[in-house]
Regions:
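Conserved donor-binding/catalytic core segment of Leloir-type glycosyltransferases
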Residues: 9-11, 168, 204-222, 228-231, ...
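Membrane-proximal helix-turn-helix segments that form the acceptor-binding/catalytic region
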Residues: 148-167
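Carbohydrate-associated surface elements
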Residues: 173, 193
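Glycosyltransferase donor-sugar binding loop
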Residues: 215, 241-255, 272-273
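Nucleotide-activated donor-binding/catalytic signature segment of Leloir-type glycosyltransferases, i.e.
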Residues: 254-274
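Short hydrophobic beta-strand element within catalytic cores of glycosyltransferases
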Residues: 288, 311-314
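Aromatic "clamp/platform" in nucleotide-sugar-dependent glycosyltransferases that forms part
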Residues: 294
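Conserved acidic donor-binding segment of nucleotide-sugar-dependent glycosyltransferases
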Residues: 326-327, 331-338, 348-353
């Protein structure tokens, strides 16, 4: 008998704006966070003829709901006002998504991240579901001050984690954190893989002057202030340039600018809204990647650099040590420690490999295998099967 097709509905803030061949009606939308890991997994799952994925997302820049198909995946773009979504604790989302699910009849729902209430919605639908942790807001609250919206999401996260049938998360640290606080959880570790372009980077490191690169959100949590404070101190010691790849955050940069000298500012180049292939291209020349983050579960920027062969100097926090093997493909320092960050940069610059923009070859091969898109797909398929098993129907808390 032919194998039955498994239909999966993703509830996701999917970065549809980044797709290369969008329908005309959607092309003028501004780009959000690229969430490249979702596109990587989707590309892998689209290779499986026994799997059918529907991506359901909500936007407010629409005249009406919109549906289109690409590479066997159907995208359902629904219209909803942001204020109504939050004010209703995502019940507005639930009602809209429930209508779509009644029409497509998914075997399974995949709730991507807590940021827009996806696990709450999935639970309300009454179908088997998987919850994917993209950021651990409870842990963030322990590490850094949270804004009002993130505090709201952190409370919803606690509810969702108490009753999710199957949860996926990335790093060993995240697995340990969740098991310690939610012992009833069924957890499937599934690393989010970088885009294939990062595995194909042809490195030509620039070492005179040293070329630093920083990738990620500009924020206190990501340690942007520590980055500039450290480089201000190093200006008299080292000849360097800094490339910052991020989404624009004019408000944060304006608050940071008075603390940065004009001389250092002239050494910095900002680049925004780059496609994954463009970011991969930018990784050809850096000597070192710098990430002084204060709280990160599994930073995608570190994974991208690790599989590209860029040495990483990063804080030893969350899942970062899963990807940065000290002395082999980078160096670690205590989070929030400016002096430790400075010492790590100085050591890396003098390192026989890192100072030339190189990493240990065996470690590079291991990283590429561990973070491969194919492995990611296998792990998520295992999570789907776990959610469809009879044991998953016995939800830990209703």
């Amino acid at each position: 008998m032919p194998k039955q097709t498994l239909t999966v509905a993703w509830i996701s803030d999917f970065p549809v704006e980044w797709l290369p061949d969008l329908p005309e009606a959607l092309r003028a939308w501004p780009r959000r966070h690229p969430a490249t890991w979702q596109m990587v997994l989707l590309s892998e799952l689209e290779k499986d003829p026994a799997l059918r994925v529907h991506v359901i997302l909500l936007r407010h820049r629409l005249e009406r709901a919109f549906c289109f198909e690409r590479n066997r995946t159907v995208f359902h773009v629904l219209k909803a006002a942001p204020w109504l979504r939050v004010a209703s604790v995502f019940w507005a989302d639930t009602l809209l998504i429930r209508r779509v699910c009644r029409r497509i009849g998914p075997d399974l729902v995949h709730a991507w991240g807590m940021e827009k209430g996806a696990p709450l919605i999935a639970h309300r639908l009454g179908r088997p579901y998987v919850m994917t942790v993209q950021g651990l807001f409870g842990w963030y609250r322990e590490r850094v001050p949270l804004g009002r919206y993130d505090r709201f999401i952190e409370r919803l996260e606690r509810v969702s984690l108490r009753r999710a049938p199957v949860v996926t998360t990335e790093s060993d640290y995240a697995v340990r954190y969740l098991k310690a606080r939610y012992p009833q959880l069924r957890i499937q570790q599934a690393e989010h893989a970088p885009n294939q372009a990062f595995f194909q980077v042809r490195r030509q490191p620039q070492v005179q002057p040293i070329r630093f690169i920083s990738i990620g959100t500009l924020s206190f949590r990501k340690g942007t202030d520590l980055l500039f404070r450290a480089l201000e101190r190093l200006r008299a010691e080292l000849a360097f340039t800094l490339e910052v790849i991020s989404g624009p955050n004019r408000q944060y940069l304006a608050s940071l600018r008075p603390t940065v000298s004009e001389a250092l500012w002239q050494q910095v180049e900002f680049k925004h809204h780059l496609l994954p292939a463009e970011v991969a291209k930018e990784l050809e020349r850096p000597t070192l990647m710098l990430l002084p983050t204060r709280a990160d579960v599994s930073p995608n920027a570190v994974k991208e650099c690790v599989v590209a062969g860029v040495p990483v100097v990063a804080s030893s926090i969350g899942g970062v040590p899963d990807y940065v093997a000290a002395g082999r493909n980078g160096l670690l320092f205590p989070p929030g420690d400016l002096e430790g960050f400075l010492a790590a940069i100085r050591t890396a610059v003098q390192h026989p490999l890192f100072g030339r923009g190189q990493v240990d070859a065996a470690t590079l091969a291991q990283s590429r295998d561990y973070l491969s898109p194919a492995r990611m797909a296998r792990n998520f398929l295992a999570a789907y099967q776990a959610a469809l098993s009879p044991a998953a129907g016995q939800s830990p808390s209703r």
